[in-house]
From Swiss-Prot:
PROSITE patterns: ILVD_EDD_1, ILVD_EDD_2. Binds 1 [2Fe-2S] cluster per subunit. This cluster acts as a Lewis acid cofactor. [2Fe-2S] cluster binds at residues 122, 195. This is Dihydroxy-acid dehydratase. SUPFAM superfamilies: IlvD/EDD N-terminal domain-like, LeuD/IlvD-like. The active site is at residue 517. Functions in the biosynthesis of branched-chain amino acids. Catalyzes the dehydration of (2R,3R)-2,3-dihydroxy-3-methylpentanoate (2,3-dihydroxy-3-methylvalerate) into 2-oxo-3-methylpentanoate (2-oxo-3-methylvalerate) and of (2R)-2,3-dihydroxy-3-methylbutanoate (2,3-dihydroxyisovalerate) into 2-oxo-3-methylbutanoate (2-oxoisovalerate), the penultimate precursor to L-isoleucine and L-valine, respectively.
């Protein structure tokens, strides 16, 4: 029978000092011997996805205490990728993921916590906490802050839906007047919550449902809706139940590594492909799998991407639907239900509710259940009122969207495309692979051959795009922006957004060893591995080289002879694999990250051979 980890600091005469300190935090005599449960919050006033989380820890803690546990809350850092975008701050985004994972490990192990509830939301916070949960392997439940309501404004007397990307794109479009840019800016992000499209934050919060570590509705229920409160309350109660099952009944099936098995990781990746999620999820799932010691690799992703169709298109892949529409269509349980019916899901994986994922689908899929409470839950909708308050409204759609032929979520028969929403490409320029969000690529450029125009930083690429150097037919190369080369693997949302703003969104391709925001669409290929700083072929590309991209056949080739590439490689070995003229201040913290980082195909995790 497992012993409470917290007994290390709460039991025995020699722990009198530790108990004295615990008492100073408010613990009473009868609390010693109860499970101490870490409430891992990420409240910050810097990030709209986290600005409403201050009181969420208290909600969870009250339920833990009522159910017989002891709750102790701490906070992690949280970086807003949108605010950090387009300047040196973006170098810190991906490294913050690993820092969050480490800080959770430090706090939980230093204080011998028995379990944890992870209150996350935005881009690197959910992955960081997920990595920590896999690493620690103690009972854990995830509950996120929820998505933002989509923005809405009138342009040319027409009501349109908006999100962050619209504000960025229109600001760079010289044909859009200042008044319209101002109107879009003030309407794009109306409430608290993670940005309203299927960007990285929402993608990851959806994937925790597929992994079995969060509750149904976690990825799609709006941050502002009163119904979301129940997710926090249930998380607090359920974590105590998981503690009892593990520590009192010796049931290891409730532990994260028992729930998030390889089959569960395949379910999560299949969901990501089906919903056209962010390419960043590939990076984070690979990293979490390594922490879980699960053999889940790019080869598995490639295999799944060849058979899973695209069942949902949400912003930025379309302007028609946002997360509030996904929820109305039944949320993640509905997409998983369609995958199950297409025999593309492992239905026997477990969840923190003690059910299999198949049992949860049977209970929560709106096309299967007649339960009015479930239908009411998925009719929760936006209020259209600017607010930073959670649970501040109780608006509902009149009906759910259960149209699987023409609705937001489709069946396999009526899929947006039989080819999935993400694809891995390989070739001589990306021997270990690269990733493209096919759900955001126009059909006319699924095959594309063009001339390379090379930039050795994101900043240089932005100047080139806005300065007129990039023309139709170019393949824009942005290199030395990988985990090592950046260091930090910046997101390239500004270059892709600016290409669209000047009318080249369907006329150019972009290839980088960096990564893309979940808000990116177009022929944008990231995670090129090995990266330039590790001697990858992307570091050998020269202006004017032909590059052939063939998404249907999963191929990307630099059309330069092996002999010429060998000559170039010898020259580059002499020069060193670093950008020629880039001026960039890099802190010691970032240098440390870059020194230990692997390429994107390994999840940009630490290279353990260097430890």
């Amino acid at each position: 029978m497992p012993i409470l980890r917290s007994a290390t600091s709460t039991q025995g005469r020699n722990m009198a000092g530790a108990r004295a300190l615990w008492r100073a935090t408010g613990m009473k005599e009868n609390d010693f011997g109860k499970p101490i449960i870490a409430v891992v919050n990420s409240f910050t006033q810097f990030v709209p996805g986290h600005v409403h989380l201050r009181d969420m820890g208290k909600l969870v803690a009250e339920q833990i205490e009522a159910a017989g546990g002891v709750a102790k809350e701490f906070n992690t850092i949280a970086v807003d990728d949108g605010i950090a975008m387009g300047h040196g701050g973006m170098l810190y985004s991906l490294p913050s993921r690993d820092l969050i994972a480490d800080s959770v490990e430090y706090m939980v192990n230093a204080h011998c916590a028995d379990a944890m509830v992870c209150i996350s939301n935005c881009d690197k916070i959910t992955p960081g906490m997920l990595m920590a949960a896999m690493r620690l392997n103690i009972p854990a439940v995830f509950v996120s802050g929820g998505p933002m309501e989509a923005g809405k404004t009138k342009l040319s007397n027409q009501l349109i839906k908006l999100d962050l990307v619209d504000a960025m794109m229109k600001s760079a479009d010289k044909t859009v007047c200042d008044d319209d840019v101002d109107a879009i800016e003030k309407s794009a992000c109306p409430t608290c919550g993670s940005c309203s499209g299927m960007f990285t934050a929402n993608s990851m919060n959806c994937l925790t449902e597929a992994l079995g570590l969060s509750l149904p509705g976690n990825g799609s229920m709006l941050a502002t809706h009163a119904d979301r409160k129940e997710l926090f309350l249930t998380a607090g109660r359920q974590i105590v139940e998981l503690c009892k099952r593990y520590y009192e009944q010796d049931d290891a099936s409730v532990l994260p590594r028992s729930i998030a098995t390889k089959a569960a990781f395949e379910n999560a990746m299949s969901l990501d492909i089906a919903m056209g999620g962010s390419t960043n999820t590939v990076l984070h799932l690979l990293a979490a799998a390594q922490e879980a010691e699960v053999d889940f690799t790019m080869a598995d992703i490639d295999r799944l991407s060849r058979k899973v169709p695209c069942l949902s298109k949400v912003a930025p892949n379309t302007n028609k639907y946002h997360m509030e529409d996904v929820h109305r269509a039944g949320g993640i349980m509905a997409i998983l239900g369609e995958l199950e019916r297409a025999d593309l899901l492992h239905s026997d994986t477990r969840t923190v509710l003690g059910m299999t994922i198949g049992e949860q689908i049977a209970k929560y899929d709106i096309t299967l259940t007649k339960d009015e409470a479930v239908h009411k839950f998925f009719r929760a909708g936006p209020a259209g009122i600017r607010t930073t308050k959670a649970f501040s409204q109780d608006c509902r759609w009149d009906t759910v969207d259960d149209d699987r032929q023409n609705g937001c979520i489709r069946s396999k028969e009526f899929a947006y495309s039989q080819d999935g929403g993400l694809a891995m490409l390989t070739g001589n320029i990306a021997l270990d692979g690269c990733i493209v969000k096919t759900a955001g690529v126009d059909e006319s450029i699924l095959k594309f051959t063009g001339d390379a125009i090379v930039f050795e930083s994101q900043e240089e690429a932005v100047e080139g795009i806005l300065g007129g150097k990039v023309r139709a037919g170019h393949v824009v190369i942005i290199r030395y922006e990988g985990p090592k080369g950046g260091p930090g693997m910046q997101e390239m949302l500004y270059p892709t957004t600016y290409l669209k703003s000047i009318g080249l969104g369907k006329e150019c391709a972009l290839l980088t060893d960096g990564r893309f925001s979940g808000g990116t669409s177009g022929l944008s290929i990231g995670h090129c591995s090995p990266e330039a700083a590790s001697g990858g072929t992307i570091g050998l590309v020269r202006d004017g080289d032909k590059i052939a991209i063939d998404i249907p056949n999963r191929s990307i080739q630099l059309l330069v002879s092996d002999e010429e590439l060998a000559v170039r490689r010898a020259e580059q070995d002499t020069k060193g694999w670093k950008p020629a003229n880039r001026q960039r201040e890099v802190s010691m913290a970032l240098k440390m990250f870059g020194h230990f980082a692997t390429s994107a195909d390994k999840g940009a995790v630490r290279d353990k051979t260097k430890l």
